Regions:
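Non-catalytic, C-terminal membrane-associated alpha-helical segments of glycosyltransferases
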Residues: 99-160
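Catalytic beta-strand/loop signature of glycosyltransferases that borders the donor
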Residues: 49-51, 75-87, 100-101
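Short, P/G- and charge-enriched loop/turn segments at secondary-structure junctions
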Residues: 20-27
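Acidic donor-binding loop at a coil-to-helix junction in glycosyltransferase catalytic cores
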Residues: 54-66
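Conserved nucleotide-sugar donor-binding
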Residues: 31-51
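Hydrophobic residues within well-ordered alpha-helices
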Residues: 70-72
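A conserved hydrophobic position in a structured secondary element of the catalytic/binding core
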Residues: 37, 63, 81
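Short beta-strand-to-loop element that shapes/binds the nucleotide-sugar donor at the catalytic cleft/hinge
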Residues: 1-17
Length: 160
């Protein structure tokens, strides 16, 4: 599988500067629009996009992170290359990001539960403490963490 770069009107992502291996520590920064893959190895490994995550689903984002996580877990090789395959025009509002609100934190908790399993509460807490002065400014990290815990519980209890 190859992760390509994207040209953007208003760059928000760090540009790739060299070919590098995508691993468990950095797969979360690449979205689905950047992926190119051969279908057969993915099918043989029994991997598909999770239907409860992504635009229009119960959990509004994270389908690409779960997909890459599953690919790496099954041993598929993923490379990031500094070649742009598309140009993104940021001329319409996001279909899933409406700000750092209740739904955002709930969905993020669900994503953490799906990827990290029993470690999800610790990852959520780490994220809240790490970004506490930035994205949790309005909500406060404790309230955001509580909403993430609700999302984690909803995945664990099968109320997806």
């Amino acid at each position: 599988m190859i992760v390509f770069d994207l040209d953007e009107d208003r760059p928000r992502r760090k540009k790739l500067t060299k070919v590098k291996r995508v691993g468990r520590s950095n797969y979360g920064r690449y979205g689905a629009a950047r992926l190119a893959l051969r279908r057969e190895p993915v099918q043989m490994a029994g991997i598909s996009f999770h239907l409860l995550f992504g635009g229009g689903a119960k959990y509004g984002s994270g389908e690409d992170s779960i997909f890459l996580h599953d690919c790496l877990k099954k041993g598929l090789k993923v490379l990031a290359v500094p070649v742009a395959i598309a140009k993104l025009h940021d001329d319409r509002p996001s279909t899933w990001f409406q700000g750092y609100n209740e739904k955002y934190y709930f969905d993020k908790g669900g994503l953490y539960a799906q990827i990290y399993g029993w470690r999800a509460p610790m990852i959520a807490l780490y994220n809240c403490l790490r970004h506490g002065k930035g994205r949790y400014k309005e909500w406060g990290w404790k309230r955001a963490y509580g909403k993430m815990r609700e999302g984690i519980r909803s995945v664990r209890n099968g109320r997806m």
